[in-house]
Amino acid sequence: MAKCFVTGKKKSFGNTRSHAMNANRRTWKANLQKVRILVDGKPKRVWVSARALKSGKIKRV
């Protein structure tokens, strides 16, 4: 799984719990989008989280 270029977000781990409270391991994937941004003055395609895009931390090219 990819990692956010800006925030470093990646998938997180935890348990799903059944009605009987049995634990099963699962993952939650971050909402990552592949976008083109300027890195050192050159356009580059990177994975960026939706939160970083919405908050304006990154500017698309």
From Swiss-Prot:
It comes from the Bacteria. It holds the Pfam family Ribosomal_L28. GO terms for cellular component: ribonucleoprotein complex; ribosome. Keywords: Ribonucleoprotein, Ribosomal protein. The keyword Ribonucleoprotein applies. GO terms for molecular function: structural constituent of ribosome. Gene3D superfamilies: Ribosomal protein L28/L24. One of its GO terms (biological process) is translation. InterPro entries: Bacterial_rp_bL28 (IPR050096), Ribosomal_bL28 (IPR026569), Ribosomal_bL28/bL31-like_sf (IPR034704), Ribosomal_bL28_bact-type (IPR001383), Ribosomal_bL28_sf (IPR037147). Belongs to the bacterial ribosomal protein bL28 family. PANTHER family: 50S RIBOSOMAL PROTEIN L28 (PTHR39080), LARGE RIBOSOMAL SUBUNIT PROTEIN BL28A (PTHR39080:SF1). This is Large ribosomal subunit protein bL28. It comes from Geobacillus thermodenitrificans (strain NG80-2). The lineage of its organism: Bacteria, Bacillati, Bacillota, Bacilli, Bacillales.
